Amino acid sequence: MARISGVEIPNNKRVVVSLTYIYGIGLPTAQSVLKTLNISEDIRVKDLTEEQIKNISIEISKYKTEGELRREVSLNIKRLMEIGSYRGLRHRKGLPVRGQSSKTNARTVKGPRKTVANKKK
C-alpha cells in the first residue's frame, strides 16, 4: 500500500478511487490532481512508479487534507457556538443545523429516543 499524506491508500483499486480515501480529497479533486500530472485515472495504485507517487503526494500537499482540515472544521463549529449564532446554538443542542424539521425524525443527530413512561389514569 502506498502512503500519501499520512494515509495508506489501497493498492488494488484505481488511482482516482484510492485518492478519495484521503479526508478532504473527493472524486473531482482526485481527477484534477491526476489531470495536472498527466496520469491516467484507470491505472491501479500498484502499477504506479515511485516518482508518480511522489508527484501525487506533492500535488495533494497543496490542498488542506486530513488533520489540518478536520481541525479547521471543528474550529469553525466552535466559533459558531462561541458567538451564539443560530447555527451555533443548534450545534450546542445537538439538533439539525441546516433547517431540517425536527418534530419527527432527526434521529441521527438527536441520538436514540429517551422514552418517558405514561402516567396511570
Swiss-Prot record:
The keyword Coiled coil does not apply. PROSITE patterns: RIBOSOMAL_S13_1, RIBOSOMAL_S13_2. Residues 110-121 have a biased composition (Basic residues). It holds the Pfam family Ribosomal_S13. One of its GO terms (cellular component) is small ribosomal subunit. Coiled coil: none annotated. Transmembrane segments: none annotated. One of its GO terms (biological process) is translation. Keywords: Ribonucleoprotein, Ribosomal protein, RNA-binding, rRNA-binding, tRNA-binding. The keyword S-adenosyl-L-methionine does not apply. InterPro entries: Rbsml_uS13_C (IPR027437), Ribosomal_uS13 (IPR001892), Ribosomal_uS13-like_H2TH (IPR010979), Ribosomal_uS13_bac-type (IPR019980), Ribosomal_uS13_CS (IPR018269). Part of the 30S ribosomal subunit. Forms a loose heterodimer with protein S19. Forms two bridges to the 50S subunit in the 70S ribosome. Located at the top of the head of the 30S subunit, it contacts several helices of the 16S rRNA. In the 70S ribosome it contacts the 23S rRNA (bridge B1a) and protein L5 of the 50S subunit (bridge B1b), connecting the 2 subunits; these bridges are implicated in subunit movement. Contacts the tRNAs in the A and P-sites. Belongs to the universal ribosomal protein uS13 family. This is Small ribosomal subunit protein uS13. It comes from Mycoplasma capricolum subsp. capricolum (strain California kid / ATCC 27343 / NCTC 10154).
